[in-house]
Amino acid sequence: MKIGIIGAINQETERLKKIIHFYIEKKINTYKIYIGKFKSHDVFLIKSGIGKVSASVATMILIDLYKPDTIINSGSAGSLQSFLKIGDIIIPKKTCYYDVDLTNFGYTRGQIPGYPKEFTVNEKICNFFKKNADKYQLKYIKGLILSGDTFVRENESIKILKKQFPSAIAVEMESSAIAQVCYKFNIPLIIIKSISDESDNNATVNFKENIDFVSYQLSKFVKIILENLIDM
């Protein structure tokens, strides 16, 4: 199986590199790609950079050059719910943009014309972790994760997002863009996130303090996914 993995920043990809065997590094423009193996899987890890456009380009590079059977988006996220704490791992079932608004044309908030109102992720992976939530100490696997080109860092912003998207559990800057490209090319997507901050007035400080730990947590769960992907 060919698996693409997308991480946005150095801390995330450096940890993920450690679980790939015999990798070589390739560079496409400013994008670094690490090509290697995990057991029988061919793995293609790319550092996308931050934000929706960068993530979309990285996803397209993976699809165009390596034609992965599945793509995994691994990264940090800010919590939007009090029951999610720093370090918790979440595997959301769906994602959408919070900074898209064409409601005046009859679309749902967050919906791009020609696309569903929310992008869904690989159902098998959700079912696997639902069955094994206690075993892997997963805090929460259902719900919606939001994406937009802002690092959410204010209490007032949380109130607005929760009002507009009541089912949202977390927010970040890449997953919906990756999901849109995967949807277009019919590539199954797995999203795995770890909470780095609570999206509040302390979010910037908390993110800086926790990103290394969060990246370590993520690498452990990506490894679990790779070990079980065929059975899923």
UniProtKB/Swiss-Prot annotation:
UniProt key word Hydrolase: yes
One annotated Gene Ontology cellular component of this protein: cytosol
Gene Ontology terms, MF aspect: adenosylhomocysteine nucleosidase activity; methylthioadenosine nucleosidase activity
Catalysed reaction, written as an equation: S-adenosyl-L-homocysteine + H2O = S-(5-deoxy-D-ribos-5-yl)-L-homocysteine + adenine; S-methyl-5'-thioadenosine + H2O = 5-(methylsulfanyl)-D-ribose + adenine; 5'-deoxyadenosine + H2O = 5-deoxy-D-ribose + adenine
Record-listed E.C. numbers: 3.2.2.9
Pathway of action: Amino-acid biosynthesis; L-methionine biosynthesis via salvage pathway; S-methyl-5-thio-alpha-D-ribose 1-phosphate from S-methyl-5'-thioadenosine (hydrolase route): step 1/2
Chain coiled-coil ranges: none
Domain of life of the native organism: Bacteria
Binding residue positions for substrate: 78, 152, 173-174
InterPro entries with a match to the protein in the record: MTA_SAH_Nsdase, Nucleoside_phosphorylase_d, Nucleoside_phosphorylase_sf
UniProt record, GO biological process: L-methionine salvage from methylthioadenosine; L-methionine salvage from S-adenosylmethionine; purine deoxyribonucleoside catabolic process
Active site: 12 (proton acceptor), 197 (proton donor)
Alphabetized UniProt keyword annotations: Amino-acid biosynthesis, Hydrolase, Methionine biosynthesis
Record keyword Hydrolase present: yes
Subunit details: Homodimer.
Similarity section: Belongs to the PNP/UDP phosphorylase family. MtnN subfamily.
NCBIfam families reported in the protein's UniProt record: MTA_SAH-Nsdase, PRK05584.1
Function noted in UniProt: Catalyzes the irreversible cleavage of the glycosidic bond in both 5'-methylthioadenosine (MTA) and S-adenosylhomocysteine (SAH/AdoHcy) to adenine and the corresponding thioribose, 5'-methylthioribose and S-ribosylhomocysteine, respectively. Also cleaves 5'-deoxyadenosine, a toxic by-product of radical S-adenosylmethionine (SAM) enzymes, into 5-deoxyribose and adenine. Thus, is required for in vivo function of the radical SAM enzymes biotin synthase and lipoic acid synthase, that are inhibited by 5'-deoxyadenosine accumulation.
Protein's name in the database: 5'-methylthioadenosine/S-adenosylhomocysteine nucleosidase
Organism this protein belongs to: Buchnera aphidicola subsp. Acyrthosiphon pisum (strain APS)
Source species taxonomy: Bacteria, Pseudomonadati, Pseudomonadota, Gammaproteobacteria, Enterobacterales
Gene name tied to this protein: mtnN
